[in-house]
Amino acid sequence: CVFDVSARTVATQSLNIFGDHSDVMACRQTGFAMLVESSVQEVMDLSPVAHLAAIEGKVPFLNFFDGFRTSHEYQKIEKWDYADLKEMCNMKAVEEFRAKALNPEHPKMRGSHENGDVFFQHREACNSVYDALPAVVEKYMAKINEKLGTNYDLFNYYGAPDADRVMIAMGSVCDVADEVIDYLNAKGEKVGIIKVRLYRPWVSSALLKVLPATAKKVAVLDRTKEPGSLGEPLYLDVAATLREAGKNDVILTGGRYGLGSKDTPPSSIFALFKELEKDQPKERFTLGITDDVTGLSLPEVKPAPITAAAGTKECKFW
């Protein structure tokens, strides 16, 4: 099965139904694969990957994108032709899926009880399925790329090939970061972003493949908060990846942003890269707010440079 989810806030000190990643991050241990998009066009392009990979890979998918910021955005996009999608569909896998579906004509028992003598072994038996899933996702991303002329991958890098400062994020903030990165690189700086596409299963080798060898400082952005944790989910995944790869010389920082649909404008991304210029940047930080309690916030760069393309007109409706 595939759940297409507009990621939203889990209410805490007050009710908030707006956009962040706190709900989907609460699903990490369910065993669902997790695919994420950062724009309306990407939702159109990559949602079929979740459905096609779920059928062939035999793993349920949680396909998510930012609530409101992406889910409610009006945008001109290129739509799929159903004939193209049909060409990519593995009908043999569909037939196997249907054959295994619950049916009173050929009943099967699911969810039987197991004691401690065998439960652990059976729980580990699914490892091979999850180990094989990234290759299935890559296969369908390659098919999408062939049809659309795109370059989707498990992780995509954007920016200077010899960047010394890199941010890692997922969701709609990536589009904002692209504009800031273009602006800074045009000024002679060397920065970039790694965009997460397949969040679960996590593939360390795919992340390391796109991380510039020149990267000295890496900032990971999470759109959720786990009180009491050493760091937020994406940060911890990246930290483990760098540690296991022996990249102990890379300075790693982690920050929170955009909780409850808090805006993350270019000024926040400028603040992030400015902080990374320091010899010892903050290990933990927040973007887009003024934290006068614990002092974690980074000062916004204001007035922020204009990063929009020349001739762009901006309008506000209310």
Question: PLM features: what roles do these ranges have?
Answer:
Residues 12-18, 45-49, 72-79, 178-180, ...:
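Short acidic, glycine/serine/threonine-rich loops at helix termini
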Residues 217-308:
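Peripheral docking tails and interdomain loops at the edges
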Residues 66-104, 209-246, 253:
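Terminal amphipathic helices with adjacent charged low-complexity linkers/tails
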Residues 61-156:
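Conformationally flexible catalytic loops at phosphate/diphosphate-handling active centers
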Residues 15-67, 91, 244-260:
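Conserved thiamine diphosphate
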Residues 142-165, 178, 298-314:
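Glycine-/acidic-rich phosphate or pyrophosphate-binding loops and their flanking alpha/beta elements
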Residues 161-189, 202-209:
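Redox- and metal-dependent alpha/beta enzyme cores, enriched for Fe-S-associated oxidoreductases
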